[in-house]
Amino acid sequence: MTLDISKYPTLALANTPEELRLLPKETLPTLCDELRTYLLNSVSQSSGHLASGLGTVELTVALHYVYNTPVDKLIWDVGHQAYPHKILTGRRDQMPTIRQKDGLHPFPWREESEYDTLSVGHSSTSISAGLGLAISAQKEGKGRKVISVIGDGAITAGMAFEAMNHAGDVHPDMLVILNDNEMSISENVGALNNHLAKVLSGSLYTSIREGGKKVLSGVPPIKELVRRTEEHLKGMVVPGTLFEEFGFNYIGPIDGHDVNELVKTLKNMRELKGPQFLHIMTKKGKGYEPAEKDPIGYHGVPKFDPSHNCLPKSSGGKPTFSKIFGDFLCDMAAQDPKLMAITPAMREGSGMVRFSKEFPDQYFDVAIAEQHAVTLATGMAIAGDHPIVAIYSTFLQRGYDQLIHDIAIMDLPVMFAIDRAGLVGADGQTHQGAFDLSFMRCIPNMVIMAPSDENECRQMLYTGHKHTGPSAVRYPRGSGMGTEIEKEFTALEIGKGRVVRKGEKVAILSFGTFLPNALEAAKNLNATVADMRFVKPLDEALIRQLADEHDVLVTLEENAIAGGAGAGVIEFMMKEKIIKPVLNLGLPDKFIHQGTQEELHEELGLDAKGIEKSIAEYLAK
């Protein structure tokens, strides 16, 4: 449902940045108010990311007002905060389709708009990409500006600091904006600091600063004294010493919700040479009181009525796999004081809130630091503790070298609880958990499990926790099947699957939660169905038995076919000279766009009807 733009008269005049830049500066506060209201009313009707965007309204308006986008390059880190950017760059009327199949992408996306410089979704990439653009712009020599906007969470990642370290070395013209949306505005924010920002970013201060450096360049001790004096003077009122040490000129912190002050400061900083760093303080959820009070709860929202001042309560029902994991942690930690649970900033999403409160000394949130999370577990395992790394499939990609080098080579007992494995739905290409089986299966010493339901998940988590080497349990986003969960823990025999339906001619080897789809498809085909349970080691005896008793084998998984579980089945059969036709069903060799999980399963032929159809067509060849 498209919103009535006549209710937003100033916003109606700014459908593109070109139109925005024609508006009188005095109208910008009104524009921000209308943009914030429009965003709230739009996202509440479509669902999506809300609190982050509410906090970046003034910054977005100021950036597009001051800079000549898309000629000047604007990069948003992660992209949760970029909804106002989408609204102001010609996509306002499409906002009701965001995160939906064939609709607007949930994050900035190059194919969608010339204003989206970088396709994003994972954090902490903006400064590296911005630096590359800035170096190229400097060589181009046409005065093109580059701005990277990064949040206080994303900037904690090592990649961001690596980029800043390099930027200070090569010294190109670029601006990094730190959007610091902690819960309260810093005491440094206010008239004095806004005035200081204008002074420090102004041409007079810069001329004196640079001129003094040139005059004193031949006298190193005096030059160092001047540098330290300037640093200490600024340090009295600004917390930017760290960024200055990286070679950036630091300005701030300033109020990120004062659009006119932002415009003044950005205009000054636009003319400065070398790496610049602007620190702004914002409030996540700004302008909508429930989101201000609960920015985590309103980070991503379902459809809701803003006038109710609350989100709709979930209907309960079947537990999510994340909850199954969280309950396992609590139950297991009650028995095992050496259990240590690690998450890279995914406490809520991974189902670890209860555990973090009940076992705070065994809970470690390392922030957005996947590489560190994995090697932290290494140290704990060497010390004799029992670490579990809770991580999304898509983010485990960021700790791949550590998985190999720091865990698998030493055969350490670290378990990975891999959430969001398979298709996650609305977050699109950057978040689909399509590759974990492929990139883990080739690692020696790994044990990889794929549960078919909630109880299998619980018992596999126990199995992995008790295993004496590296292991992984991968499970999907969302609710389970309603299977009864056994409270007692039972370790599964490593590398053993089970036949759950006897048929003839065709055997479906199911890996993971597609098992109900396989069973439904098997009815009309009268096919055998096996729940393989283990991707590594494979149940080779069961594969051999199924190949002996059937004409065709079909593998089924929610992972890329390339290098996945099905590929492992074929590798074993070829090694053993078991010559039988094998049909691999799974995710195709392409990045999967957004849509609901059900829509994507149907589109890719991985629902029951699609599986049955694919097998029937294969048999007919």
Curated annotation (Swiss-Prot):
It catalyses: D-glyceraldehyde 3-phosphate + pyruvate + H(+) = 1-deoxy-D-xylulose 5-phosphate + CO2. PROSITE patterns: TRANSKETOLASE_1, TRANSKETOLASE_2. Keywords: Isoprene biosynthesis, Magnesium, Metal-binding, Thiamine biosynthesis, Thiamine pyrophosphate, Transferase. GO terms for molecular function: 1-deoxy-D-xylulose-5-phosphate synthase activity; magnesium ion binding; thiamine pyrophosphate binding. GO terms for cellular component: cytosol. Mg(2+) binds at D152, N181. Thiamine diphosphate binds at H80, G121, H122, S123, G153, A154, N181, Y288, E370. InterPro entries: Dxylulose-5-P_synthase, THDP-binding, Transketo_C/PFOR_II, Transketolase-like_Pyr-bd, Transketolase_BS, Transketolase_C, Transketolase_CS. Binds 1 Mg(2+) ion per subunit. Binds 1 thiamine pyrophosphate per subunit. Catalyzes the acyloin condensation reaction between C atoms 2 and 3 of pyruvate and glyceraldehyde 3-phosphate to yield 1-deoxy-D-xylulose-5-phosphate (DXP). Homodimer. PANTHER family: 1-D-DEOXYXYLULOSE 5-PHOSPHATE SYNTHASE-RELATED, 1-DEOXY-D-XYLULOSE-5-PHOSPHATE SYNTHASE, CHLOROPLASTIC. This is 1-deoxy-D-xylulose-5-phosphate synthase. The gene is dxs.
